[in-house]
Amino acid sequence: MVTHTKPIYRRIVLKMSGEALQGAEGFGIDTTILNRMVTEVKELVKIGIQIGIVMGGGNLFRGAELVKSGMNRIVGDHIGMLATIMNGLAMRSALNHAYVHSHLMSAIPLNGVCDHYNWMKAINLLSNNWVVIFAAGTGNPLFTTDSAACLRGIEIKADVVLKATKVDGVFSTDPIQHPDATLYEQLSYQDVLERELKVMDLTAFTLAREHNLPIRIFNINKLGALKRIIMGYKEGTLITK
């Protein structure tokens, strides 16, 4: 196993899905998971890692189901953006409670609640050891929060996008339905496309590939996994050119 005495990444984007935040519950925020993530983030901040967090919102609102029932897709996406802001507020509060400097930025204006997103300000905050939380996706409907994670990663010049999920990485097929599925340690962008592996939506993935932005998929429920990745341990699945 290759390890390093120093971190292999300096600036990261952590994509937190809403589903990861809800834990075993079917809805809402599991404060145990939230507080554990804050502890792990705080540990990384102490060693100088610059962290941007992109929030999902699926634990609070699943627009796809309502769209099937007749809701306008644009309206559904706007509600979803608000859900990510709610998660962002919870994350900011938890980080501040742990004495971690954090700043919440939204892609849509929400005066009095959080700042409007500004990439130059985000980079300045990161450089000064603040955790920056990005909410409201890209600010546009029809784009996922995975796309937002890749976009923000490119804008802030992140070394990698770390996608926190509830599985150990990218498998050859669904590991829940097929226990014998193969876990890939490393893939190229081309491998993912040719094998039609479910990593991110195509827009997000194409954006990362065009800008040579590495993606690592890992299990957020594995204690210490985030730091192991930062320190160069093999964890989850790494996707590069």
Swiss-Prot record:
Q: EC number(s) in its UniProt entry? A: 2.7.4.22
Q: Name the catalysed reactions.
A: UMP + ATP = UDP + ADP
Q: Name one GO cellular component term.
A: cytosol
Asked whether the keyword ATP-binding is assigned, the reply is yes
Instruction: Give GO terms: molecular function aspect only.
Output: ATP binding; UMP kinase activity
Chief place of localization = cytoplasm
Residues that hold ATP according to the record? 15-18, 58, 62, 165, 171, 174
Q: What Pfam families does this protein's entry cite? A: AA_kinase
Segments for region (Involved in allosteric activation by GTP): 23-28
List the InterPro entries hit by this protein, alphabetically: AceGlu_kinase-like_sf, Asp/Glu/Uridylate_kinase, Uridylate_kinase, Uridylate_kinase_bac
Activity control note:
Allosterically activated by GTP. Inhibited by UTP.
Biological-process GO terms, alphabetical: 'de novo' CTP biosynthetic process; UDP biosynthetic process
User: Where would you find this protein in the cell?
Assistant: Cytoplasm
| UniProt pathway | Pyrimidine metabolism; CTP biosynthesis via de novo pathway; UDP from UMP (UMPK route): step 1/1
Q: List the disulfide bonds.
A: none
Q: Which UniProt keywords apply?
A: Allosteric enzyme, ATP-binding, Cytoplasm, Kinase, Nucleotide-binding, Pyrimidine biosynthesis, Transferase
Annotated UMP binding sites: 57, 77, 138-145
Which PANTHER family does its entry note? URIDYLATE KINASE, URIDYLATE KINASE PUMPKIN, CHLOROPLASTIC
Q: How does it assemble?
A: Homohexamer.
Tell me its family: Belongs to the UMP kinase family.
**What does the UniProt function comment say about this protein?**
Catalyzes the reversible phosphorylation of UMP to UDP.
Identification of the protein by name: Uridylate kinase
State the species of origin. Blochmanniella pennsylvanica (strain BPEN)
Which gene name does the record give?
A: pyrH
